[in-house]
């Protein structure tokens, strides 16, 4: 076999191994530091899914009653996933995983001997270390094992890439999403909201999008900052001016060419040519 061909095949194999390391080397365990990270969630938003979009991540609170997967009574779970570079499903990175019971009791992870252990904080302020909440990674999911299947809320922080937020339909029902300061939607070329909604309000320079009865497989919001709109408008005006300038230059060149033709007689009207007239007395 040609040496270059062999090296090429080896390189492709290493690339495939690197890209799919989750499949070849196993999913790995969640980082204890991720699970024990501190985050404050809005437990009283009053919707089935509350999504707070920040510059670098999304803090989310989901009502576990209306989730679309993991409904096994013996092992209730909430399963998170994202899309890889080849559009394959892969486990989603979660940080600051917390749970809140309907009565206000909360569960969060704390670091104990280098491991993340779930600690229950009761409404009277007392705490207890109990294994009621756990997280594992499979080849294509990050699975949160819930304390209960019937009620409660799950709070997680998820990564965000650029100015787009895309979520599978983890729960059905009402959604609301707060975008970062100065973020807006509305210009088709710069933004997208799917499924669409006309329920949009602005408070403290943050746009709030709301949906009722969501059962779509995916929720996608792409937004722009107001300064992006000014930049885009400036570019559009610049492109228009360049186009007008080009048209004016072309028009002037055309007029100059016509003038030169007239000067050398190339545009003389053939009806005025004496050679085409009949001899005298025969006209």
Task: Provide a role label for each language-model segment.
Residues 1-102, 272-282:
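N-terminal pre-first-transmembrane soluble regions of secretory-pathway and organelle membrane proteins
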Residues 1-30, 177, 203-283:
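Hydrophobic alpha-helical segments
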Residues 29-41, 105-169:
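Non-cytosolic head/periplasmic domains of membrane-anchored proteins
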Residues 55, 160-163, 259-260:
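Context-gated lysine
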Residues 61-68, 112-113, 147-150, 212-216:
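Secondary-structure transition/turn motif
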Residues 72-128, 169-195:
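Solvent-exposed beta-hairpin/edge-strand motifs
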Residues 128-148, 157-231, 235-237:
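Intrinsically disordered, low-complexity linkers and stems that provide flexible hinges
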């Amino acid at each position: 076999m040609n040496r270059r061909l062999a090296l090429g095949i080896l390189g492709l194999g290493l690339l495939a191994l690197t890209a799919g390391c989750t499949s070849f080397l196993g999913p790995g365990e969640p980082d204890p530091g991720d699970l024990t990270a501190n985050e404050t969630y809005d437990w009283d938003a009053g919707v089935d899914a509350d999504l707070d979009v920040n510059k670098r991540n999304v803090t989310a609170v989901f009502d576990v009653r209306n989730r679309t997967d993991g409904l096994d009574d013996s092992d209730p779970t909430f399963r998170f996933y994202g899309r890889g570079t080849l559009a394959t499903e892969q486990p989603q990175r979660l940080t600051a995983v917390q749970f809140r019971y309907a009565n206000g009791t909360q569960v969060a992870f704390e670091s104990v001997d280098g491991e993340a252990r779930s600690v229950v904080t009761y409404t009277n302020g007392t705490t207890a270390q109990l294994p009621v909440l756990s997280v594992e990674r499979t080849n294509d999911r990050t699975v949160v094992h819930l304390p209960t299947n019937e009620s409660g809320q799950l709070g997680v922080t998820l990564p965000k890439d650029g100015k787009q937020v895309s979520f599978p339909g983890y729960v059905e029902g009402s959604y609301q999403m707060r975008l970062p300061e100065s973020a807006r939607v509305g210009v088709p070329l710069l933004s997208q909201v799917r499924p669409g909604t006309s329920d949009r309000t602005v408070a403290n320079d943050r746009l709030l999008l709301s949906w009722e009865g969501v059962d779509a497989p995916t929720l996608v919001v792409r937004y722009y900052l107001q300064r992006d709109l000014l930049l885009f408008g400036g570019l559009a005006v610049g492109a228009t001016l360049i186009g007008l300038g080009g048209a004016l230059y072309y028009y002037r060149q055309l007029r100059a060419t016509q003038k030169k033709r007239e000067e050398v007689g190339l545009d003389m009207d053939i009806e005025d040519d004496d050679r085409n007239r009949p001899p005298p007395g025969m006209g």
